[in-house]
């Protein structure tokens, strides 16, 4: 009996050592939230391969996450539901302050520009032609909503905003003639279904701003953030990584620091 106990004890000890020898990263899973500019299924198709790529480069596990609409995404950011998050510039300056998210990366060589789209056969030629029009906007989006609304208000162009769930919803509604115009950004416009894009044209484009932030919640260890940042910054040097970036219309990813979003703070936009 004592021999059995000795072997059993040895088995337990060996098992414990084996468990302790597994890299910590193998047990870690981080929730990566993506702003719902497009449908959840579309975002999952685009971003899941990117997260899988980052898994192979860092050894950490990433769970794709989004929300059914932007207000829900905002609540989850406020409550710190995402370990990592890709968020628009306005969200970043809000939730850096309210929830502690800290930017570590952004799109390379990119300035975020808002656009207003109309049906391809629309008579509208200038932004002033939209006076008194009903216009579709994605709820609380920065360049697709807050910027064009602020510009139109400054120019005394009256309009009636109608809020929809996503950028794709804007493009679909304008393409189908439900609204004469709507707000978006170039990246989602290029990414939207040709069924909608081929029936639209861009009426107006804003000036450029610091783009969306890749940010980490303060609970994520700094060495993990550093490893994720390194992997993202190296994507455009690798054929597979470059192809994945191309799928989301990015040339590359570069380091980002909090102060780089001061141009957005200077707008003093109130949603």
Task: For the regions a language model picked out, list residue spans one by one.
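Periplasmic-binding protein-like
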Residues: 31-37, 43, 109-118, 195-232, ...
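Extracytoplasmic small-molecule ligand-binding "clamshell" domains
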Residues: 27-91
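A structural signal for short loop-to-beta-strand junctions that line the ligand-binding cleft
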Residues: 99-108
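Short loop->beta-strand "edge-of-pocket" segments that line small-molecule binding or catalytic clefts
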Residues: 28-37, 43, 128-144
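Bacterial N-terminal signal peptides
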Residues: 10-19
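Sec/Tat signal peptide C-region and signal peptidase I cleavage site
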Residues: 22-26
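Short helices/loops that flank or line small-molecule/ion binding pockets
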Residues: 71-85, 98-99, 128, 168-183, ...
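Pocket-lining segment of extracytoplasmic ligand-binding domains
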Residues: 122, 132-223
């Amino acid at each position: 009996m004592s021999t059995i106990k000795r072997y059993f004890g040895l088995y337990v000890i060996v098992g414990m050592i084996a468990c302790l020898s597994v890299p910590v990263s193998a047990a870690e899973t981080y929730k990566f939230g993506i702003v719902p500019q497009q449908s959840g299924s579309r975002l999952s198709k685009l971003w899941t391969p990117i997260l899988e790529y980052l898994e192979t480069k860092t050894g950490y596990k990433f769970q794709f996450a989004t929300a059914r609409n932007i207000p829900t995404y905002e609540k989850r950011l406020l409550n710190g539901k995402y370990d990592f998050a890709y968020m628009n510039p306005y969200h970043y300056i809000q939730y850096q302050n309210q929830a502690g998210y800290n930017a570590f990366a952004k799109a390379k060589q990119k300035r975020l520009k808002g656009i207003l789209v109309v049906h391809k056969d629309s008579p509208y030629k200038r932004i002033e032609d939209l006076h008194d029009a009903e216009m579709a906007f994605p709820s609380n989006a920065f360049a697709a909503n807050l910027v064009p609304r602020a510009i139109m208000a400054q120019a005394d162009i009256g309009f009636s905003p109608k809020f929809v769930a996503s950028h794709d919803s804007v493009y679909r509604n304008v393409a189908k003639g439900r609204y004469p115009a709507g707000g978006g950004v170039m990246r989602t416009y290029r990414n939207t279904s040709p069924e909608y894009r081929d029936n639209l044209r861009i009426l107006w484009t804003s000036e450029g701003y610091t783009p969306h932030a890749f940010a980490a919640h303060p609970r994520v260890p700094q060495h993990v953030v550093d490893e994720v940042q390194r992997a993202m910054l190296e994507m455009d040097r690798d054929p597979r990584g470059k192809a994945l970036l191309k799928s989301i219309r990015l040339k590359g990813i570069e380091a980002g620091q909090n102060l780089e979003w001061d141009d957005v703070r200077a707008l003093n936009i109130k949603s």
